[in-house]
Amino acid sequence: MDELKPDVLQVHDLGMSMTYMVSKWARKRNIRCVLIQGTYNTTLKPGLKQLECLFNRTFGKAVIKNVNAIGAKTKAAAAYVQKYYNKDVSITPVGLDESKFVGCSTQSDFRKRYGLENQVILLYVGVMEQRRNPLFLLDLMKAMPDHFSLVLVGEGPLFAQVKDKVKKDSIHNVVILGKRKQEELPAIYAASDLFLLASSYEIFGMVIMESMYFGTPVISTSTAGADTLIDESNGKVIDGLDVNAWKKSILQIAEDQKLLSEMKKRCQYYIANNLIWDKASDNFEKLYFA
């Protein structure tokens, strides 16, 4: 790195050995160094939990001493740092790169193509894996009225199990699209009424931002990204995976067209005015050049 002669260095996460080494290198050379924290929960794995806490209180102490400023992707990540050290932490959520959607149309015959013209569309986009709880979404759909349909976009370790459960349990109101190209997503987001994210852990959750950007309110479990991006005016955060609680929240929003319309507008406004990169980068610049 000596050859690069950086003006500012950004390191990630308190508990990383690379973070310690780079921040130490920067301090020796009087180079401004900024820590950005994403992790917000201590690991639950036996043994590793104690090791993580020990690292954070030893090498982590050196990291805090070495860096000039601290940012966190979410409020939960900020609290994680402050659990160990009484330091100022700025909230620096990542931004949405609009350029990847340039030329992508939000207009399509998506509803007609899949026979969903008169349906309330609930959408999930992401990896079919354990921490995202796609099987819970299927249990939820068994409790929803017939005019609600769930569209699943993505593949992953649980993909086959999801397909098997839909068939075995005769869940007729689910459309499984599998993996889709990036340019197809805007039309799918725009055609949907609500986005569902039942994750047990999300450092941020880019799909939340993408969905809100295209005007689709998100109902999510309480994870770091959801708690930072969503409030009662633009979506809903629910503690836990209780089918009745999720059903109640979905019905309250989806069956009130005025409320749903207002939420859609607030979603788009919030992302466009705060979290596209042109806006979000302001928070990082304040840390870099303070």
Regions found by a protein language model. Give the residues of each.
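Nucleotide-sugar donor phosphate/pyrophosphate-binding loop at the beta->alpha transition
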Residues: R32, N41-A62
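Carbohydrate-associated surface elements
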Residues: A76, G95
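Conserved donor-binding/catalytic core segment of Leloir-type glycosyltransferases
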Residues: L116-M141
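Nucleotide-activated donor-binding/catalytic signature segment of Leloir-type glycosyltransferases, i.e.
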Residues: K163-R180
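Short alpha-helical donor nucleotide-sugar binding micro-motif in glycosyltransferases
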Residues: K179-R180, A187-S192
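Aromatic "clamp/platform" in nucleotide-sugar-dependent glycosyltransferases that forms part
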Residues: S200
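Short hydrophobic beta-strand element within catalytic cores of glycosyltransferases
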Residues: P217-S220
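Conserved acidic donor-binding segment of nucleotide-sugar-dependent glycosyltransferases
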Residues: D231-E232, K236-V243, Q252-K258
